[in-house]
Amino acid sequence: MKLLTSRLVAALAAASVLAAVPLSAARAETPKDMFVMATLLDEFTTLDPGEIYELVPEEYVANTYDRLVRVDLRDPSKFNGDVAQSWTVSTDGLTYTFKLRPGLKFHSGNPLTADDVAWSIQRAVLLDKGPAAVLTGIGLTKANVVANVKRLDDLTVSVTTDQKYAPTFVLNVLGSWPASVVDKKLLLSHQQGNDFGNAWLKTNEAGSGGYKLVKWTAGDSVVLQRFDGYRLPLAMKRIVLRHVPEAASQRLLLENGDVDAARDLSPDDLASVVKSGKAKVSASPQATLLYLGLNTKNPTLAKPEVQEALKWLVDYAGIQANVVKTTYKVHQTFLPEGFLGTLNANPYKLDVAKAKALLAKAGVPNGFSVTMDVRNDYPYTEIAQAVQANFAQAGIKVQLIPGDNKQTLAKYRARQHDIYIGEWSADYIDPHSNAQGFAWNPDNSDKSSYKMLAWRNSWDIPQLTKETDAALAEPTAAKRAQRYQAMQKDMLAHSPFVIMFEKVAQVATRPGVSGLEVGPINDLVSYRNLKKQ
């Protein structure tokens, strides 16, 4: 191991001091050039971007590695070059050619070239871990990735897809964490057999991003140091992520000045720190939707009038105000806020009379009995109980069947439920990530290879599947957005999904802290613009 510089030693020392301070102790605020955040680090099992498939680890990758492009959060139809300076698409729509910025370097000091970019994408596919599935979305497989992802010269790389896709979709895939650029020379020096350096990278880092890894202590902390060779200026010299599982402990650390930000406060804790003036809170909608899935194998739930009636039998505003509060907001369409083509329409509210009229039209004027599989955890249990009471107003008797996440999900995936309450989270910020889940079912048979959400609810939708495929291939971003908006309008009126809420990330920061960018997915959380007064 190389000797640590004095700055890195200082960072580690500061982190250890912070960890040792009792929660009740009053102390000076964190150093002006250090940002300390209380968060949850229990998802970390590896540091390899080709293996990571969890939320907070994706955030780590987003700040230690670069990729070809990144989506513009202000306009999801646009992309900003990361290591790519410019790019073109061939006339047949299959090949994307990227020109790289000259003079880029990895944290190791090795130059970043097109060979590294091509090898990084090939590596992720050939490793065949969870993230490879994202790259498979544009047709890259173990059989073709070496031929389809090529270095043309030191500053030019090309990626060829298996069919014509919307350019926004391809760029979203190539701008996601599985396509992170890794240091080929460094990883090959640590390769064991044919593991592409995976064993070494599980606990080390080989990136070129704004911050480099100093130390990861599993279940405790991650310490990052500013990469002074980065192409953009960074105000924070050090970033320290602390694992603090209890929300109350996060609040005390924040109030005492031991951390600059807390990511996992409860609604009551958030209200408390704002009232005391010791913190400010920012809210960022997340690409996670909480919904009811209605299994159309149940003949009653298969009736369109029943599906619509249930949408009028949820007290969305009441549940939001009394159960989930500021951690979720009402959202009823399948594309989350911030996605290309999002339709922010919430036409449904609790209307028992309208629901009863629809049930009568469906031939069940007195209601019916049904089961709901519920994960025995907050907020699922509390929301399910509220929905149970709502449905009872129209004579619908709901039997709640509690279970852990593994049990309820297994039953859902086997299509053995009546109603399932759960969440869907997008892997990347492209509308296809959700359209494929809610509006695509090419084979409704039990032996289907495509078991997405529509399949799980036995919803046979050949026409909507064609529309999803057409939207995926639409080359013009504006027309693509229109296609998704039309699909959302159709599904609001006719679908076995009662989409209720969108998750909201609430971040509490100390006064004087600014610039923490929290996108709709963890892969789009950035420390680049962090500042402290």
PLM region descriptions:
Residues 31-41, 85, 95-97, 117-121, ...:
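Short, well-ordered beta-strand elements
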Residues 36, 113-122, 154-160, 164, ...:
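Alpha-helical secondary-structure segments
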Residues 85-131, 152, 158-160, 250-253, ...:
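Aromatic- and charge-enriched surface segment that lines or borders ligand/interaction sites
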Residues 199, 226-272, 397-399:
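Ligand-site clamp/hinge motif
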